[in-house]
Amino acid sequence: MKNNLLFTEHKLGPITLRNRAIRSAAFENMAYGNKPSQDLYDYHTAVARGGAAMTTVAYCSVTRSGVSFDGQLYIHDEIKEDLKKLTDGIHAEGAKASIQLGHCGNMTHFYTCKCMPVGASTGFNLYSPTLHRALKKEEIKDIVKAFGHAVDFCRECGFDCVEIHAGHGYLISQFLSPYTNRRRDEYGGSLENRMRFMNEVMAEVMEHAGNDMAVVVKTNMYDGFKSGLKVEECIRIAQEIEKHGVHALVLTAGFVSKAPFTVMGGAMPIKTLAHYMNPWSFWWLRLALRFVGHLMIPTVPFKELF
């Protein structure tokens, strides 16, 4: 095993990893009250103790409006000390600490984000479920700046790397996909225009990351449904991301509000999903899923992605 490439040191941008095993971002649901918990600390320090070179905290929104679930983090001063404790714990086990930054766009509802959900365009998200409005240009600029601020914040908390979430139908993905982006300004229409928000975010992130933080981007290989992004477009998007000088790509697939189980390679458990829905807030959607869910949501047969 000594000569196995997996267990050799690797340079990821400005940081050196003790091996090539990285725990990529996957939602833990351990940020109770939108704050880091002891469970979150124990989980990631255990990953580091197990020998991983880097472990990634997921998911942290760059603003309050970008929180998708109650168990998620968002950038604000009250979590700084707890995040410092978390990164100290990871570093004590010999691993690097990474955090996933993003904005969920329309993948939320008022009770969670405390505001009218926003997206690339106005519409209705069945998954949340919620109505959402299109972002104004000045709001787009504010979110771009929030990504830069988030990178600075995470550096102060001791993180070595940030992973930018540009897939799965979250906000950057909503701008990229023709399914959710029906804008008629410079942020919509052609793929070049649909990549504009992503490019602005990446430029801001790379400027603030400087020479001491690694930057990784999670991006789709395809959206997983007919009117979404295809492989050819996703290749162009990946090439565009690379132009910014990012240090690695995390390849994924799927669109939570349309093809959520594409990335997992299986069909959505409609009955189970309906069972666990809040009966008071979503009673109408719960009934709809039980009776006609199989007509609304396609079955996704298992297949290997790689």
Annotate the PLM regions.
Residues M1-F306:
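Flavin-dependent oxidoreductase catalytic cores
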